[in-house]
Each structure stands twice: as C-alpha cells, then as structure tokens.
C-alpha cells in the first residue's frame, strides 16, 4: 500500500474514533441543544459580567430563564445578567422561554472572564506579533555585528610582527624597540679595541 493511501486510511480511522468518542461523552441527563435559524442568543462579556440576551422572536411576554434544566429564580427579563461569572459554576446549557413556548432553544455557555482583560481584534494581535519579531531580529543583528567587530579588533591588537605581515593598528605608531646594547653597532669616528683589524708583523 502506498504511503499516501496509508495516511488517508489512518486519518479516516482517527476521525471516526473522535466522532464516536464525542457521541459517547454526551450526558443523557443534560438537555440536547436545539438551535434554529430564528433563535439566536446574544452574548456579551464585560470584565467578569456575562449578559445573555434572549432571541427576539419570543415577544414581550414574561420570559423565564433556566440553566441545565433548573429554573433560575427572579430572572424574568429579556436579558440575563451573570455577575462574577465562574467557568466552573456558571457554565452549562441556558434557555429562555415563555409559558406559551412549544419548545426551548438552548445555548451552551462556557466562557473565561477576568477583571482586567482587554479585548484585542485579530489585526491588532497580528501587528503586535510582527512588530515584536522585527524588533527582536533587529536586536539580534546589532548584537551579532557588534560582537563580530569586537572580535576582529581584538585579533588585530594581539597579532605581532612575527605573526605574518607588518604590524597593524596601534603597533604602526610605536617606534621600533631599542637594540640590545651588547650588539650595538660601532659608531664612525670611535676607536675601540676591536674597531678595526691591526696587522702584526711576524
């Protein structure tokens, strides 16, 4: 079997196992979510407060709210305000209905809220990431060129005249060292013991 077909078969197997596992995870005690095109809930989050707005097709009759099949007391308006929303305690299936409603439309709500969160749209998030990457790359290039120049200057200072070629850099300005006095050349006009060859008669 070619490798491409093997990957397709493996993908189909994983997909079927995932769908089968998802069906098994449904709790039969929880209400099944039913949504129609006309029943659309509106959800707005501000800080730690979540506001649910009932669909418009229910009219202005007395609206009741329930969560996970239990009626919420003292909640009869078109909007349901959930202050200090907790993901663990307040998540679940919500429904709003009137006494004349034939069926209930459920909304599964699971949200994470925080006190000082700021909502950022997609373009702003992408711009922040791109700017961060560009600044980081620019900083890395500056460090690279600075370390490269520092290494080149240190190699130039350490190289001596015998390392091949003329001395460069600061060695160019220094005068050559004074010769050793033991090997100092004889000056003209100076007569020392060994300044010339004397012939002796035999």
UniProtKB/Swiss-Prot annotation:
Keyword Transmembrane helix: yes
Transmembrane segments: 126-146
Stored SUPFAM superfamilies: Immunoglobulin (SSF48726)
Naturally occurring in which organism (per UniProt): Felis catus (Cat)
Ranges of residues in domain Ig-like: 33-107
Designated name of the protein: T-cell surface glycoprotein CD3 epsilon chain
Region (NUMB-binding region): 170-187
Main location: membrane
GO CC terms of this entry: alpha-beta T cell receptor complex; external side of plasma membrane
MF term (GO), any: transmembrane signaling receptor activity
Function: Part of the TCR-CD3 complex present on T-lymphocyte cell surface that plays an essential role in adaptive immune response. When antigen presenting cells (APCs) activate T-cell receptor (TCR), TCR-mediated signals are transmitted across the cell membrane by the CD3 chains CD3D, CD3E, CD3G and CD3Z. All CD3 chains contain immunoreceptor tyrosine-based activation motifs (ITAMs) in their cytoplasmic domain. Upon TCR engagement, these motifs become phosphorylated by Src family protein tyrosine kinases LCK and FYN, resulting in the activation of downstream signaling pathways.
PROSITE patterns named among the record's database cross-references: IG_LIKE, ITAM_1
Entry keywords, A to Z: Adaptive immunity, Cell membrane, Disulfide bond, Immunity, Immunoglobulin domain, Membrane, Phosphoprotein, Receptor, Signal, Transmembrane, Transmembrane helix
Signal peptide: 1-21
Keyword set includes Zinc: no
GO biological process: adaptive immune response; cell surface receptor signaling pathway; positive thymic T cell selection
UniProt-annotated location(s): Cell membrane
Record topology, Cytoplasmic segments: 147-202
Phosphotyrosine found at: 183, 194
Pfam families: Ig_5, ITAM
Annotated region (Proline-rich sequence), positions in chain: 174-181
Region (Disordered): 156-202
Self-association state and partner proteins as the record states: The TCR-CD3 complex is composed of a CD3D/CD3E and a CD3G/CD3E heterodimers that preferentially associate with TCRalpha and TCRbeta, respectively, to form TCRalpha/CD3E/CD3G and TCRbeta/CD3G/CD3E trimers. In turn, the hexamer interacts with CD3Z homodimer to form the TCR-CD3 complex. Alternatively, TCRalpha and TCRbeta can be replaced by TCRgamma and TCRdelta. Interacts with CD6. Interacts (via Proline-rich sequence) with NCK1; the interaction is ligand dependent but independent of tyrosine kinase activation.
Membrane topology: Single-pass type I membrane protein
Disulfide bonds: 54-96
